[in-house]
Amino acid sequence: MLLAGGEAREIVVDGSGMIMGRLASVVAKLLLAGWRVNVVNAEKIVLSGDPRMVVESYRTTVLGVKSHFSHKWRPKRPRTPQRLFKHAVRGMLPKNKARGRRALARLRVYVGVPDELKGREFVRFPEADASRLSSHYIELGAVARQLGWKGGVEK
């Protein structure tokens, strides 16, 4: 979406130390408003709760057998941090409508900071900051490693 001057409305969000659900809801609202959103440091996004319970919950969802007939009929679940976050945002968008699909297409999620975004100003949302958590939390990168992610950057 273009502003009156012709420049695109684009924002770069630093995901390190942010609560996943709260960050995903803010990002979903920005996407529906027409912003192009880039989220960097996806592996440092925080999930609140007991780490063992969070990993076990994701493990049963992602690695659970949904079809005993054939592995190719099983639902394909994300295992990388950037896809896990994008899947969370997707759940907060009207994905079956053209408006929601266009909004999801404007989202880019990265592990680390890519070269083309270095030097840009990163935005942080205080309502999604993990400093409000008292103790139990785990980073999305640690959950992804438990699910089989090798720690590489997706192209």
UniProtKB/Swiss-Prot annotation:
Superkingdom classification of source: Archaea
Give yes or no: UniProt keyword Ribosomal protein. Answer: yes
Q: Which Pfam families match?
A: Ribosomal_L13 (PF00572)
**An annotated GO BP:** translation
One cellular-component annotation, GO? cytosolic large ribosomal subunit
Keywords of the record, alphabetical order, are: Ribonucleoprotein, Ribosomal protein
MF terms in GO: mRNA binding; structural constituent of ribosome
This protein's record includes keyword Ribosomal protein = yes
**PROSITE patterns noted in UniProt:** RIBOSOMAL_L13
User: Which HAMAP family does the record match to this protein?
Assistant: Ribosomal_uL13
Family as reported in the entry's similarity comment: Belongs to the universal ribosomal protein uL13 family.
Quote the subunit structure annotation: Part of the 50S ribosomal subunit.
Q: What does this protein do?
A: This protein is one of the early assembly proteins of the 50S ribosomal subunit, although it is not seen to bind rRNA by itself. It is important during the early stages of 50S assembly.
NCBIfam families referenced in this protein's UniProt entry, alphabetically: L13_A_E, PRK06394.1
Q: What is this protein called?
A: Large ribosomal subunit protein uL13
Give the organism the record lists. Aeropyrum pernix (strain ATCC 700893 / DSM 11879 / JCM 9820 / NBRC 100138 / K1)
Source organism lineage?
A: Archaea, Thermoproteota, Thermoprotei, Desulfurococcales, Desulfurococcaceae
